[in-house]
Amino acid sequence: MGFKKLVSFQPDYVPQYHITKYISERTKLQLVHINHKTSPLVHGYFAVPTECLNDSGAPHTLEHLIFMGSKSYPYKGLLDTAGNLSLSNTNAWTDTDQTVYTLSSAGWKGFSKLLPAYLDHILHPTLTDEACLTEVYHIDPENLGDKGVVFSEMEAIETQGWYISGLEKQRLMFPEGSGYRSETGGLTKNLRTLTNDEIRQFHKSLYSSDNLCVIVCGNVPTDELLTVMEEWDNKLPEIPSNIPKKRPFLDNKLSHIPQSRDKVTESTVEFPELDESQGELLFSWIGVPYSDFRNDLAVDVLLDYFTDSALAVFTRELVEIDDPMANSTDCCTDYFMRTIIDLRIQGVPTEKIAATKTKVLEILKTHTIDLSRVRQVVENTKWEYLLNYEKNGESRFSSAVITDYIYGNEDGSSLVSSLKDLSDFDALLQWSQKDWQSLLNRIFVDNKPIIVTAKPSALMYEQLEKEKSDLIKQREAEFDDEKKLVLLKRLNNAKNINDRPIPKSLLQKFEIDNPSKSVEFVNTKSIATVDSYKYNNVSDPLTKKILETRPDNFPLFIHLNHFPSQFIELHFLVNSASIKDTSLLPYFNMFDELFSMPMKILDEESNVETMLSFEEVVAKLKSETIDAQINQGLKGSCPDLINFKIQCRAGGYSNSVQWIKHCLFDMVFDENRVRILLENYLNSIVEWKRNGNVMLSSLTNRNLYSARSLKKSTDPLFVEAKLQEIFAEIENGNFEKEILPRIETMRKQLRANFNKFHILVLGDISKIDDVYEPWNPLIKCLNIAHPVEKLKIPPVPRALDTISSICRTPGEKAFIITTPASESAYMNLITSIPFNLDYHDPEYAIVSLASEYLECVEGPFWKGIRGAGLAYGASMLKLCEINSWGFNIYRGADIIKCYEVGKQIVQDYASGALEFDEQLIQGAISSIINRLATIECGYFETALSKYVDEFCLQRGNNFNELYLERLQNVTKTDLKNAMQKYFVNMFDSNKSVAFVSCHPAKLESVQEFFETQGFTVEIEELEDDDDEIDSEEDENA
């Protein structure tokens, strides 16, 4: 007996993938192999359908405890430590109806070593009380606050408006006894009382081979995969064939979802926030059954029709209007037994909530579907679907497989129906207007919604603060010094047991010989249209054709990257340094909306100019491209490049190029359009201020960069006052006189320096008829004189040229921003490491490896900070482009202790009190290799990565190879020297700058702490919408 093949098929639209589904005849375990060769990574998704009938958090806490050891490998962190050694990365998520464990490996060799151990952890975890204490919840013996990794994670989101409204929706939509009703992450009040016995019982009830689906995606030999799986499966207890397979949710009649709802149910909830200016609305409907794929797709199309793009009905009626009723509309679906459809209306002025709610229902009831537009949405959705599957097939396919495993047919037939072809798209293109109108009425009108209004409440904010204060006072009365000592001993005992060293001999089984040579990276072909490019392979027919057909005096630099694809991705990169007046840079927040502005079109034969409305422009853009956007930088590098990014079908290259010309010359900054979009942007800042991590990034960027940098000059908090002034000017009738000339000056300066344009074309270049001819209209408009100077590779703007004085010489300052709507704290500690953009500096590999050693899973920061429940994450910031390095805390429960523990760890390695572990060093190197493979996980990603390495960072297209060689040569002495020379500086107030985002209740203690550390503290408080935010002084600019 072994694995029986259930189905095997090749999706018509992405033939590079082949999907085969098996079932173990012994144990009923299911295995799905998604075979393809388009990535160096092998991905694993190990899915357990998990139904929980309460808010205890048992599914989520169990997910965390799975990683704390198994019966065969009874050591906390073995899975992650072994993962480091085997070029692998592990993770997991818990959702309402599933818990999924993931494994990502750079190659099959490491994956195959770790797979049996991982599955052993899932089905046979140790689930010790000690692991539960540190990982889930405990009381801090010193300050009597709440700690624990899971607790910290849930505390960070539990007071957010979206979370509270989502939970209320579940309560109203599903009855008592339904698994869909529960908060599987665990409410914090329940995490305090959840016992390990309850978690063990939950595992016993659901974690078995007949409720586990193992999904493996990548370049994996089928016979080897089956051999590994059969060897492991044979060790499991047999499940007799007469015992029905577990089907959570399907087996529970109370979890069955009715076909529809016959009445509207409404509720209002509050979330704690000092700024009471904006709330949000959540509408939720019951959709179609899982197996009704065509109608489910049709519902998705309708949701896009109503919410996606400037043409969307809700966008036109609620958002992009005078005196807007909302900042944005968004939709999502939960693929349960029946689809649950959520529509969120965000950034609703609190005084307009009732009117907005009425307006949404009225639109749905009275709107007449535009057949031509809905068919265009179907067409766009189809090509977006294809592009997503080509770029992220493993993620898309695995998600579909997981849903089918929970709700589909056991024989695999429903999986084939859902993924085999695109016939549902073709069928929807034939639907009549009546068909679409009928669907709209059936799902969104006759079928009644749940409506949840989420309102911000300053009173609730104060009440919660009082409750927390009262809880601490109650504990202070309850826990005298003796009881605190008991807590401390119990916690220290748990840490000692959890941190038992893993035998070196056991870890050696997971090591990979010569890891840097064991990964097969994806290859693409680079072609640059300049003679000086040394990597052009002139013997290659395609390269030869491209170079030979280049017109004389062609003035633009084009770099092409060729690989198999149905699509072209165009990046037109403009150097923002061309904008001489830095006061113009905040106008980028209007400039990036160019793709949705009106456009003038000149008929060259009649010399008659016509104007397309913005609606006509967006419709035309949608018909000629798949996606178009304007943003900053390229793959996280060179943030001062303005990137016009267009994705299109392979035959759409010529039209896409014309859109670049349209943006630079033809788009019209219409006064009404600019005013509406600007007002929407300003209103959206309220929502950003509620996110502690976003505010940390803002605080950091506004101080590390000068106003010359887009990082600072487009930051929402930095530009808020400036954009409010601009908006006031428009309201006062000064658009034509004051505002438009400045925007046009910015555009004129950007397009003037054509020799600074970087043009990057990715995809199947052989499908482009003529690379050069489509650029002629733009070249003509640029009025480039001929002959031009010999074409050279253009320079790129260096972020290092736009840094502030405090970034150049950090010291003494600590900046704190308070975020009332965010319970968790976030921190960056920044110091200087002056590599001066030389990635070949001998110390670069040393510092990189030292960083990875500290932050890798089960490394020092992981054990000392996350493992102690002090924060959800602790990592290193590698800001090499601005000569900076740093220490980051994400979702901190105790930011002060995070600082202290991080400082102690670094100092101990610098002094020699802690010795570097050879296996952990090798694990850190393997983690870096895995990250490189993840960065280059497909053709498009590889092509972008090559371009960044070669042209943006200027470190050569073979940098990774040289870098990995250097990593292997780093010694323990090198690492210790790096700690002494650089890393201790992060915690030295004379050589670092600190940035903290925290709740106002923590401000006083955090401020006092940083002052005791020698920092001068500057505070920025976010409260209500009327409070002004002081910008930094010019000397930091």
From Swiss-Prot:
GO terms for cellular component: cytoplasm. Present with 8120 molecules/cell in log phase SD medium. InterPro entries: Metalloenz_LuxS/M16, Pept_M16_N, Peptidase_M16_C. It comes from Saccharomyces cerevisiae (strain ATCC 204508 / S288c). One of its GO terms (molecular function) is metal ion binding. Disulfide bonds: none annotated. This is Uncharacterized protein YOL098C. It holds the Pfam family Peptidase_M16_C.
